[in-house]
Amino acid sequence: MTLKTLKRVIRITKQLLKDLEMLLKQTEGLGINIYTHGEMLPSHGYEGLKKYKHLAGNFGGAWQDQQKQFDNLPGCILMTTNCLMRPRDTYKDRIYSTNVVGWDGIKYIEKKPDGEKDFSEIIKQSLELGGFTEEQEAKEILVGFGHEAALSHAVELVEAVKSKQIRHFFLIGGCDGARPGRSYFTDFATMVPDDCMILTLACGKYRFNKLDFGTVAGLPRLLDIGQCNDVYSAILIANALSDAFGTDVNGLPLSLIVSWYEQKAVADLLALLSLGIKNIYLGPTLPAFLSPNVLQYLVDTFQLRLISNPEDDIKTCLGQAV
C-alpha cells in the first residue's frame, strides 16, 4: 500500500493518548494528517481514535532513531512524554513539547486549568509547511491486542493450549536502546518455534514487529499488547489464563523476556516482582541500581536471570536441555 500524498503533517510521539485525542479534534477538517510515532503506535487499535480519518498511520519506530526520522519529516512534531533526544537544528524550530518533557529552545504547550490544551500554534505552523510532495511507501501491521481484545479470544487460547496447538507464550518487550546487544531480542523472536505465541509491548517491539510471524491455532502469532504502560494488560491476560488453567502465573507456559533501559521499566519490573512473577529474563544489562546483595536476593527469590544467547534461553524456557 502507499500513504496518501500529504500536503501537511503533524507527528505525535510517546505515550499520552489524551493529547492525541485533543490534537485530532483540533485538526479535524483542516487538511492536516496526523501520524503517530514510537509508543503512540497502539492508538490505532482504539475505536475512539480510529474514527478520526486524518489519523493516517505510524511514521518511524523506537525513540533512539528519532533524530534521523524527524530530520526527514516535512512537518511538525509533538513530544508528549520523555525519551526526547537533543533536537537537531534541522527540526528544532518545528518540534513542540508538553507535559513533563522539554528542551531549551523548543516551544512548550501548557495545560489549561480544565486539562485542555491549545494546539493552535503547532497547527498554524504545520499549515505553513509543505508536507510530503509524493506518495510514501507503507507496510501494514496488526496492533490493538490490549487485554480486552486479547481476552475476547480467551476460550480459543485455552483450547489451543489444551490441544497442544500452542506450546508456549513468550512476552518479548520493554524499553529499546541504541547500545550493542539488543539484536538479541530480534534473534529471540525469530527463533521462537512456530507452535508458540509471542506477546509484545513497549518500544522494544520495534526490534521485530514488522516481521511476518504468521498464525498459530488460527490466531496471529504476534500480539501487540500496547505501550510500556500496558504491562498492566499483560498481567490481566496472564491472570485470566492462570485462572482458566487453575494455576498461578508462574505455572503457565509463559516466559517473560524483558528489554531493560530506564525509569518506566523500573516500574514495570517492580510491578511484576510485586505479583510474585518469577523467571524473568532481563537484558542486555541489569539495572545499575542493583547492588550485589539486592541482585542476589532477586535471583534467589524470583529467579531473575540475565539474558545469555537466544537459542539457549529458548531451550531453557521450553524445558529442553541446553
Where are these regions (language model features)?
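Anaerobic metallocofactor- and corrinoid-dependent redox/one-carbon enzyme cores
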Residues: 1-322
